[in-house]
Regions:
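Short juxta-domain linker segments that transition from a proline/glycine-rich
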Residues: 1-269
């Protein structure tokens, strides 16, 4: 069957537009005329192999996504994230796309080189809490998760290491939007049988907020992986119950109430 250059062109155009890259920048990057580049996106001009590899680098994609019709990727999740968060800057979009590639690279190394086995996380959305109070669900899930991991009542010293040990890909990247705390993506390539959990934490934040954001996104992995993606903002939308739950989980997971009561209860005479 003949290769469909029109489909390739549409993929290239979607990838370029998702990162807010102009056709002029792309043509300049390839050192070809603007019209020649537009003809590539329109499927009228056949792209060369080296040009395709260069564009894959520029657009932060795996080149196989462009040339394979059924190549699995997180493209739909990322595009949906950008669509729902249209105000994302060009640099933040690039940082997010680079984060996705880092997760893919890490997954390849862990599976193919280090033979790491997949870890199955509990899906607390399927758990029967017996009530619909989201903040309380977050607190109770934190208790269940600490029990599952045998954490006792001690504060978590390294939340990033703990999350990585659960088979989750987690990275810190600098995002220029200071209102973004972190984000979660369920990557279909990283784990074909289980959710491919990927977490990004904004490196611009102080360490305390980074730790809280990591635990917050961990809650989204435990509850909300079916949504495919989400971005967490410091200033939460009113009425977002999933974010209430994730905040409640994060605080109680990092430092349980029992520890606070033990360490800071008023001294008795």
């Amino acid at each position: 069957m003949a290769f469909d250059y029109a489909v390739l062109g549409r993929k290239l155009k979607d990838a370029r537009e998702s990162l807010l890259i102009s056709p002029q920048d792309s043509s300049s990057y390839l050192k070809i005329s603007l019209q020649n580049y537009l003809d590539i996106e329109a499927g009228r001009n056949r792209i060369t192999g080296d040009q395709l590899v260069l564009l894959a680098v520029l657009y932060r994609r795996d080149f196989r996504y462009f040339v394979t019709g059924d190549y699995p990727s997180a493209e739909s999740q990322v595009q949906e994230m950008f669509r729902r968060n249209a105000a994302l800057s060009k640099s933040d979009r690039v940082a997010i796309q680079e984060f996705v590639r880092l997760c893919e690279y890490e997954d390849f190394l862990e599976r193919e080189i280090f033979q790491r086995q997949s870890v199955s996380l509990p899906n607390y959305r399927q758990f029967s809490f017996g009530h619909r109070y989201f903040k309380r669900q977050g607190e109770e899930a934190a208790i269940f998760e600490r029990e599952r991991l045998n954490l006792g009542t001690q504060p978590i010293e390294n939340i990033f290491e703990l999350i990585r040990n659960q088979g989750i890909h987690i990275f810190k990247r600098q995002l220029e939007d200071k209102n973004i705390s972190g984000l979660y993506i369920n990557h279909p390539v990283i784990n074909e049988l289980l959710p491919g959990h990927c977490i990004l934490v904004n490196y611009l934040d102080d360490l305390y907020r980074q730790n809280f954001s990591a635990a917050h996104e961990y809650c989204h992995a435990l509850f909300d992986s079916f949504q495919g993606q989400e971005i967490t903002y410091l200033k939460l939308p009113n009425g977002d119950k999933n974010e209430w739950r994730a905040n409640s989980f994060a605080g109680n997971f990092l430092v349980p109430k029992q520890r606070i009561e033990l360490d800071y209860s008023p001294a008795k005479n």
